[in-house]
Amino acid sequence: MTTSIIKNQEIKNKLSNPELRLKDIIKTLPKECFQQNRRKAWTQALLSVVMVGLGYWSLAIAPWFLLPIAWIFTGTALTGFFVIGHDCGHRSFAKRRWVNDLVGHIFMMPLIYPFHSWRIKHNHHHKHTNKLDEDNAWHPIRPEVFASWGKTRQSAFKLFMRQRLWWVGSVGHWAVVHFDWRKFKVKDQADVKLSVAVVVLFAAVAFPTLIATTGIWGFVKFWFVPWLGYHFWMSTFTIVHHTYPDVPFEAENKWHEAMAQLFGTIHCDYPKWVEVLCHDINVHVPHHLSTAIPSYNLRLAYSSIQENWGDYLHDELRFSWSLMKLITDECQLYQTDVGYQPFKDYYAGR
């Protein structure tokens, strides 16, 4: 860990050079990375539809003892739905905006995720990646903020981190952030209202129909548990993308765009079947250099980044329980200009 910290401090010093601009890094990427391919885009969409269909078929025929496997598969396949919507939100799925909006709404509808709400908030994350008090994805809690909370809220947050409940984090983010159009700029509120109406209408039709035909257990079996499976991956991808003991979050006056997007974004390998079903969302460094890169070109772009900027990249990670244990045990609070602080160090200093 010490060697890694020293290396990463050297990288930070290099990237803090104000002459290094994000657009200079983007210029080194092959033009092919930005080319949209209609066949590849729709093949990915079809793959997700087939895999989700396969998942629901397995849920329908599986004996009770095989349901956990079917739930895991279906939840992961549904994450592919989100990734298709993700490309649509960045306008990298199709050249026509109306196609992106239509496909985005269709694929995020079963997840009850308002498309425009997510798109707008997610774009803010890209503009302010790893910037303290601005990034709205997985943002660390500063000690002074934690100290200002009441005992109940502090206890809830400590329980969340210590019991490693990161996997439900995106459920709270989904519920709190995406349905209240008053939290958006006036110019965006009409789009947000439309997306909220779409998912509310879908739920109003699909949920009663599902319950009427399969009962409450059918609702839990066919929608709720797979939906939680999707949120497991949503939460996991989101936290791992930008969180590690040596990855900095900077105050606005010290924030450096190239530093945040190139070094502050982490490549993590997952089981191959997860990467296929989720359309390489784990190959995340290129996506933070340019959101115009379609998901099917991420690996091509990452190979170029490794070749030209490999010395500036964070060490690659591999998804495992030990990785998630490290993140949730060490990345609990964040001291400005210092780094992450576990609760035990916070309380030891008081």
Curated annotation (Swiss-Prot):
<feature type="short sequence motif" description="Histidine box-2">
    <location>
        <begin position="122"/>
        <end position="126"/>
    </location>
</feature>
<keyword id="KW-0444">Lipid biosynthesis</keyword>
<keyword id="KW-0560">Oxidoreductase</keyword>
<dbReference type="GO" id="GO:0016491">
    <property type="term" value="F:oxidoreductase activity"/>
</dbReference>
<comment type="similarity">
    <text>Belongs to the fatty acid desaturase type 2 family.</text>
</comment>
<comment type="pathway">
    <text>Lipid metabolism; polyunsaturated fatty acid biosynthesis.</text>
</comment>
<feature type="transmembrane region" description="Helical">
    <location>
        <begin position="219"/>
        <end position="239"/>
    </location>
</feature>
<comment type="function">
    <text>Desaturase involved in fatty acid biosynthesis. Introduces a double bond at carbon 12 of oleoyl groups (18:1) attached to the sn-1 position of the glycerol moiety of membrane glycerolipids.</text>
</comment>
<dbReference type="GO" id="GO:0016020">
    <property type="term" value="C:membrane"/>
</dbReference>
<feature type="transmembrane region" description="Helical">
    <location>
        <begin position="98"/>
        <end position="118"/>
    </location>
</feature>
<keyword id="KW-0276">Fatty acid metabolism</keyword>
<feature type="short sequence motif" description="Histidine box-3">
    <location>
        <begin position="287"/>
        <end position="291"/>
    </location>
</feature>
<feature type="short sequence motif" description="Histidine box-1">
    <location>
        <begin position="86"/>
        <end position="90"/>
    </location>
</feature>
<keyword id="KW-0443">Lipid metabolism</keyword>
<feature type="transmembrane region" description="Helical">
    <location>
        <begin position="196"/>
        <end position="216"/>
    </location>
</feature>
<dbReference type="Pfam" id="PF00487">
    <property type="entry name" value="FA_desaturase"/>
</dbReference>
<keyword id="KW-0275">Fatty acid biosynthesis</keyword>
<keyword id="KW-0472">Membrane</keyword>
<feature type="transmembrane region" description="Helical">
    <location>
        <begin position="41"/>
        <end position="61"/>
    </location>
</feature>
<protein>
    <recommendedName>
        <fullName>sn-1 oleoyl-lipid 12-desaturase</fullName>
        <ecNumber>1.14.19.45</ecNumber>
    </recommendedName>
</protein>
<keyword id="KW-0812">Transmembrane</keyword>
<keyword id="KW-0408">Iron</keyword>
<feature type="transmembrane region" description="Helical">
    <location>
        <begin position="64"/>
        <end position="84"/>
    </location>
</feature>
<dbReference type="GO" id="GO:0006636">
    <property type="term" value="P:unsaturated fatty acid biosynthetic process"/>
</dbReference>
<dbReference type="InterPro" id="IPR005804">
    <property type="entry name" value="FA_desaturase_dom"/>
</dbReference>
<keyword id="KW-1133">Transmembrane helix</keyword>
<dbReference type="InterPro" id="IPR012171">
    <property type="entry name" value="Fatty_acid_desaturase"/>
</dbReference>
